[in-house]
Amino acid sequence: MSTRISRSVYADMFGPTTGDRVRLADTDLIIEVEKDYTTYGEEVKFGGGKVIRDGMGQSQVTNKDGAADTVITNAVVVDHWGIVKADVAIKAGMIHAIGKAGNPDIQPNVDIIIGPGTDIIAGEGKILTAGGFDSHIHFICPQQIEHALMSGVTTMLGGGTGPSHGTFATTCTPGPWHIGRMIQSFDAFPVNLGISGKGNAALPGALIEMVEGGACALKLHEDWGTTPAAIDNCLTVADDHDVQVMIHSDTLNESGFVEDTIKAFKGRTIHAFHTEGAGGGHAPDIIKVAGLANVLPSSTNPTRPFTRNTIDEHLDMLMVCHHLDPSIAEDLAFAESRIRKETIAAEDILHDLGALSMMSSDSQAMGRLGEVIIRTWQTADKMKKQRGSLPQDSSRNDNFRVKRYIAKYTINPSIAHGVSKLIGSVETGKMADLVLWSPAFFGVKPDCIIKAGMIVAAPMGDPNASIPTPQPVHYQPMFGAYGRALTASSVVFTSQAAAAGPLARDLGIAKALYPVSNVRGGISKKSMIHNDATPTIEVDPETYEVRADGELLTCAPAEVLPMAQRYFMY
């Protein structure tokens, strides 16, 4: 016997369905469910008196014969490819299926089998996303990794050796010895990790040594001398070994101007860090490279979005991070040349146009690694408020804008760094690196972080309490973050040369090495999903005004942001 219930009652019980809309945190961003893979009247739900019981929603099928290890029920999946309601199956640490779960012996349309060996994560009323990828990490301290993980980031790529002055300023791990020691340390951390070697050299030998020693990318940084010769040599080595190059160009224009750097690229693919320029790069016009077909541009989060406080906080940050002395006039001039309200305002709009493709942190080096996700959505909200709906969206929802912005910290850095076959989206066949959110806390405080199919972190109440919820509630590492479960649930990204050689054996590591691939001529700006715009960008050298295809890009700084003090005491 069937019965009819209201949409609100249905949503309370099983989560939103097709046509229902959900607000993301306290922003003005609204998503609308595009499709529901579940079957009305046959939904599965766990709990006392609920559906997933033996002989009902749970079948007799063994895991060996096809039952899932874990099913996330009735979640709203938000990803670059769509916004849908579905059950999501995890098997052997991978995303096995996105569809309708249940017992095929008694239920129709079942493509995910729940058996006695299946665990359940309740996704009703929740949003499910891919784990975030922060591709601009200064590995200054190991405590960073837990902070990033608790924010929903499950993959980190960068360079450094700890709190050395080279690491404070540059995302480079210099030399094979340091690279090897850093990779050995990675066995302690429950996230995917990759090392960028120092790319500043005019001859190839030292760079080849680092790539073969385990680096998955090379980083050119002005503090080590990003000259045209170093750029050309680094890109040549990268082409030979299929690794990505990231660049922080010459702020002082000592060895050339932005045109000279572009010439040194020779049309080759390169990932441009903090493309606006406050984080470093040719002053005042490095932002021009965001319009080039071979440049994969990203932002770092301290300039995201442009607010009334952005300019004031940057000067002190820069002096500390780049070992500058405020009593030296030249050091002060160097710092002031990098901080321009005009280019920071333009950065907001270029993100909204899809001309800036990725978001990252610049952790502890003019960036906050726990705020990559928050600041992405704050930027999206600011642009919705100031620019209205995108042409691709309707008055009902912001689905396209949401897909554009989520791609900036999930699939696009995964493509840029050659790991999109493994991570970066909620798609079958990929590692189950997933984050579950309550809509009211979306992008701010996750409900649950899943790493390769195992819960690795979550908010947890007093361990001595009679139930899991009593205060104090803290984010805590879970069983997936301990022992051999940790090393079995995450990987180290390396070059193909390193993965194919004896590196893992020589270093004695437990984590698997995963080789990056297809990061050179096989990708370009057009590979950046929903973020592939290539406008002609011009910067006035006197006023710093930025134009894209002749249109002035300017916006007011935000006075108030969402996802801020409503959620945090400090």
From Swiss-Prot:
Annotated GO MF terms: nickel cation binding; urease activity
Binding, Ni(2+) 1: H136, H138, K219, D362
Residues where N6-carboxylysine is found: K219
Localization per Swiss-Prot or TrEMBL: Cytoplasm
Transmembrane region(s): none
Residues annotated to bind Ni(2+) 2: K219, H248, H274
Residues engaged in binding substrate: H221
Disulfide cross-links: none
Family named by the database record: Belongs to the metallo-dependent hydrolases superfamily. Urease alpha subunit family.
Protein name as it appears in the record: Urease subunit alpha
Organism listed in the record: Rhodopseudomonas palustris (strain HaA2)
Gene name tied to this protein: ureC
